Structures are given as C-alpha cells and as structure tokens.
C-alpha cells in the first residue's frame, strides 16, 4: 500500500508520455531509494527549468535565454524550417545537417480539433520573412493535418518572395519527425523539393 504522497507522485509520473503505472512505480521506487543521487538533483533541475526556460518569442522553441540561442546565432543560414513541435526541432538539431533557424507551430491545422491558422503563430512566421530569409522548409508530418498545414503555408507564403520547400521522401506517411533516426532525417532534408 502506498501513502498519499507516493500515490500522487506515481499518478503524475504515469501521465508522462511513454510511461504507464508500472513504469511510474518503478521510477518512483528508484528515486526514493536513491534520494541523494537521483531525486534531489532531479528536483533541482526541474526547479531551474521551471524558473528559467521559456518559449522563444521569435521561433517558439524553448531556451533559458530570450531570444533563444538559435535565433540569436548570426552564423545561422538564412533559412527557416517550420516544424510542428519543439521535439521536431530538437530531432533536426540532433541530426546536425541543418544550420538555419526554426519556426515551431505548436500544432497543426485541424478542423476536428478546432485549430485554425491564428492558433499556430503563422502571422509571426510571415512577419519574420523580411527579405533576409531565402527559403522556408516545411518539415511537417506526413499526416492529413500535416499535409493540410503544408498546403495552407505554401499558399500563404506564395507572395512573400521566398522559396518554399518540403522534406523529401524518407518521412513515412503517418510518421512524426521526432521519432526518425538521424540518417533518415539527413536524407529527407537534403532531398527536399519545392512545395505546391
């Protein structure tokens, strides 16, 4: 039998993606058994992240500095890669084949979910196209909502004076950017094509 504090902690852990009740119990037991080595450093790291990490007002990524390190890096190429989530941005950064900037939508257009263009920061993206950006790369999932979002963005950006491209094959239909291995991401990014 678990006390209320442990039960609450297990319940919160089980709500994390990829964790069920059994995994959550094992994690909580390990954290409690190794309080000094694991639990206290985790608490400190979570507290620091909660206090310092915020959404970048430019790209929508996460960082402890504002604007984020990527947006502030003048050595980045004049490209913007549009992704659905921060996890997708991190996956592309891990692949180390892209040196431009990002725009994180935070979702996709979806009539069923009630997400329209105003919910995705698309106006912020258009405002960033000030003449210094030469290409917008749409790195969106190959799902119905991803395709609809890519189509909308292609039409919306057609008059902005930038080349709009999409990732090439290698991203499976129904697949998510964040789960792809670095080799697949590198191939898809290097073989991108014009959208539309």
From Swiss-Prot:
Domain Toprim: 78-172
Statement: the UniProt record of this protein carries the keyword Chaperone: no
One biological process term in Gene Ontology: DNA recombination
This protein's UniProt keywords: DNA damage, DNA recombination, DNA repair, Metal-binding, Zinc, Zinc-finger
GO molecular function: DNA binding; zinc ion binding
Chain ranges of zinc fingers (C4-type): 56-71
InterPro entries per UniProt: DNA_Rcmb_RecR, Rcmb_RecR, Rcmb_RecR_Znf, TOPRIM_dom, TOPRIM_RecR
Signal sequence region: none
Function: May play a role in DNA repair. It seems to be involved in an RecBC-independent recombinational process of DNA repair. It may act with RecF and RecO.
PANTHER family noted in UniProt: RECOMBINATION PROTEIN RECR
Similarity-based family: Belongs to the RecR family.
Record-given protein name: Recombination protein RecR
Organism: Acidiphilium cryptum (strain JF-5)
Phylogenetic classification of the source organism: Bacteria, Pseudomonadati, Pseudomonadota, Alphaproteobacteria, Acetobacterales
């Amino acid at each position: 039998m678990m006390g209320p504090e442990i039960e609450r902690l297990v319940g919160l852990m089980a709500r994390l993606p990829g964790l069920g009740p059994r995994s959550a119990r094992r994690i909580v037991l390990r954290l409690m058994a190794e309080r000094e080595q694991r639990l206290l450093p985790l608490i400190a790291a979570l507290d620091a992240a909660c206090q310092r990490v915020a959404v970048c007002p430019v790209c929508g990524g996460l960082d402890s500095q504002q604007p984020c390190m990527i947006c502030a890096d003048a050595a980045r190429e004049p490209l913007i890669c549009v992704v659905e989530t921060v996890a997708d941005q991190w996956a592309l950064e891990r692949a180390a084949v892209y040196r431009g900037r990002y725009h994180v939508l935070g979702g996709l257009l979806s009539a069923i979910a009630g997400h329209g263009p105003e919910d995705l920061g698309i106006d912020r993206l258009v405002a960033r196209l000030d003449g210094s950006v030469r290409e917008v790369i749409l790195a969106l999932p190959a799902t119905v909502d991803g395709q609809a979002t890519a189509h909308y963005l292609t039409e919306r950006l057609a008059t902005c004076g930038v080349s709009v491209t999409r990732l090439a094959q290698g991203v499976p239909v129904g697949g998510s950017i964040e789960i792809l291995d670095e080799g697949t991401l590198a191939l898809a990014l290097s073989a991108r094509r014009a959208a539309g």
